[in-house]
Amino acid sequence: LYTYPENWRAFKALIAAQYSGAQVRVLSAPPHFHFGQTNHTPEFLRKFPAGKVPAFEGDDGFCVFESNAIAYYVSNEELRGSTPEAAAQVVQWVSFADSDIVPPASTWVFPTLGIMHYNKQATENAKDEVRRVLGLLDAHLKTRTFLVGERVTLADITVVCTLLWLYKQVLEPSFRQAFPNTNRWFLTCINQPQFRAVLGEVKLCEKMAQFDAKKFAESQPKKDTPRKEKGSREEKQKPQAERKEEKKAAAPAPEEELDECEQALAAEPKAKDPFAHLPKSTFVLDEFKRKYSNEDTLSVALPYFWEHFDKDGWSLWYSEYRFPEELTQTFMSCNLITGMFQRLDKLRKNAFASVILFGTNNSSSISGVWVFRGQELAFPLSPDWQVDYESYTWRKLDPGSEETQTLVREYFSWEGAYQHVGKAFNQGKIFK
């Protein structure tokens, strides 16, 4: 796969290959591939007449360009759509990404990266278009985990990659909060192992990036100026460091300017620990998790928990899904729980939970018992943790009460009468 580094269009094929098992070797740097040079050579143009990247060459000599075509080629039947109807819907969303998302996303994001001039009216129009797109997706995803069917397809891969720079660069919390279903789906996808293997850890935008006129000016190629005679007195009088700086500034911006900018943006400082302000606690959650994972729950893990639990440094909470009437198939309800856990991945060091699905198809409920660092709900501490929690009611538990003792025992062991539920245990999920 010929491409330049951090090309979001190439990500589509690489993520698809993670799902299908296709072995793809990436050539994105000299001497194998130099963007702006290699793709203009006669040899490259014989294989790929458009001279565009990404471009794919198979071991058997098969060549194809255009990112959607490459992603389709390296996919399997499940990703492409296993029925004619599903396949048509996949093509629908892939086309939608190109026609409805790429244009406004480019108009809005590119100026903030310093690679396109800013036009206020065009940017405002682009923002409106992005709102429309996110709203359309939000309505579609209200009752769906993924865009087509119950598993990831090329539709999800393509639309996620197309939205990637919007979420990283300009969709700050206040803008994206109006689209909870789209946010939930996006976070579910990027936290799948196959996505993470290609994208790494995606940091969502915290403050909308703005156009920087200076950055834009610096990114433009400089006009040629008359060369001074070698060894001129004026040149010799300047300090060596200053001459180097002038030489560096005079160099034209490389054709890969977008990619260098993307890489710089990706190299962001590590986020602060949202729990750093809390005093140290004697309760070591990781040790309890080891007991819970490796020892008997009732005879070892629970006694350890109550013996070491620090009620001042930690708190217990009972949660219940607000909309049980919307729960239909049990496997879809389980997807709600799993998706929430995936989106809370960074919370694992400071939380533990047992969440249970009760009942059967079209008659079920979800509730759980959570352990959090501190005395308040942890979700408001990070925008990334706020996607799901408002879909649940939360009640703080008294560690000393008999009710809490019963809830912790039943939910942590997955055994008991669950008299407060009124439905039979179906299955449970552990967040640890």
From Swiss-Prot:
The modification N6-acetyllysine is found at K142, K207, K396, K429. Keywords: Acetylation, Elongation factor, Isopeptide bond, Protein biosynthesis, Ubl conjugation. Residues 271-432 form the EF-1-gamma C-terminal domain. One of its GO terms (biological process) is translational elongation. Residues 216-258 are annotated as: Disordered. It comes from the Eukaryota. Residues 216-249 have a biased composition (Basic and acidic residues). The modification N6-malonyllysine is found at K429. Residues 83-211 form the GST C-terminal domain. Pfam families: EF1G, GST_C, GST_N. There is a cross-link at K248 (Glycyl lysine isopeptide (Lys-Gly) (interchain with G-Cter in SUMO1)). Probably plays a role in anchoring the complex to other cellular components. This is Elongation factor 1-gamma. It comes from Sus scrofa (Pig). The gene is EEF1G.
